[in-house]
Swiss-Prot record:
NCBIfam families from the UniProt entry: lgt
Gene: lgt
Membrane-spanning ranges: 16-36, 55-75, 87-107, 198-218, 232-252
Pfam families in the cross-refs: LGT
Pathway: Protein modification; lipoprotein biosynthesis (diacylglyceryl transfer)
Keywords: Cell inner membrane, Cell membrane, Membrane, Transferase, Transmembrane, Transmembrane helix
Protein name (Swiss-Prot/TrEMBL): Phosphatidylglycerol--prolipoprotein diacylglyceryl transferase
InterPro entries: Lgt
Entry's localization field: Cell inner membrane
């Protein structure tokens, strides 16, 4: 199956180009605002619309800075040490979920203190917004024809531009489904009942780690790294500890009494 030609630029205004991938980020942050606002209301938190906007803005900064720094440190440090000016060339790509997660956690701790909310409570109301952004982001990867999967002979294999002219797993779509609607529904199911603060967040950590670990078996490893430990990629080495930590913490936190 040939990759459908989709122009990565959806709108041009003179020399300005607006790309689908950037649009996915914007839509993800907009959706996050409404999801967090609704979740805060259900929790009875005294957060105004401006407070929620402050939270989303802080987390967005954490995602962007952490995601960029994480990619540099985890995936391509030697290149950026040799080309330091490329550190700021974010339009060329290069973002890491795991770095973005660390950035979000740090930003979340900061904004939780500013708004006088317990971090576990804030993490719980924000966690369901993450799958929306993740799912949209993976669709952006697919539109760009990047982060494609390994060579395959399955009927739905796609020949991506730059993919060697052979069918590959559309692993971006696998991730879009698992990290998007599937993970969102899991978090919504967990959050339906009143639970100790932090359970929803740690459930997100566990299932993201699990889904990412599994999909990495179908995803082409980063060219500059390859497989690092037997059949495992960098993404798997970062994701499996997430799964173990998230699962352990979700079980431990769920045993506490309900409350902030």
């Amino acid at each position: 199956m040939q990759f459908p030609h989709i122009d990565p630029v959806f709108f041009r205004l003179g020399h300005l180009e607006f790309r689908w991938y950037g649009l996915m980020y914007i839509l993800g942050f907009i959706a996050a605002y409404f999801i967090v606002r609704r979740a805060a209301g259900r929790r009875g938190l005294a957060l105004t619309q401006d407070d929620v906007a402050d939270v989303i803005f802080s987390l967005a900064i954490g995602v962007i800075l952490g995601g960029r720094l994480g990619y540099i440190l985890f995936y391509n440090l030697s290149y950026y040490l040799s080309h330091p000016l490329k550190l700021f060339a974010v339009w060329e790509g290069g973002m890491s979920f795991h770095g973005g997660l660390l950035g979000v956690i740090l930003a979340g701790v900061y904004v939780a203190r500013q708004k006088k909310i317990g971090f576990p409570v804030l993490a719980d109301i924000c966690a369901p917004a993450a799958p929306v952004g993740l799912g949209l982001g993976r669709l952006g990867n697919f539109i760009n024809g990047e982060l494609y999967g390994r060579v395959t002979d399955v009927p739905w294999g796609i020949i991506f531009p730059g993919g060697g002219g052979v069918p590959r797993h559309p692993s971006q779509l696998y991730e879009a489904v698992l990290e998007g609607p599937v993970l969102f529904l899991i978090l919504m199911a967990v959050g339906r009942r009143e639970r100790p603060a932090g359970v929803v967040f740690w459930t997100f950590i566990a299932f993201y780690g699990l889904f990412r670990f599994l999909v990495e078996f179908f995803r082409e490893p980063d060219a500059q790294l390859g497989l690092l430990a037997g059949p495992f990629s960098m993404g798997q080495l970062l994701s499996f500890p997430m799964f173990l930590l998230g699962l352990t913490m979700a079980v431990l936190v769920s045993r506490r009494k309900v409350g902030p």
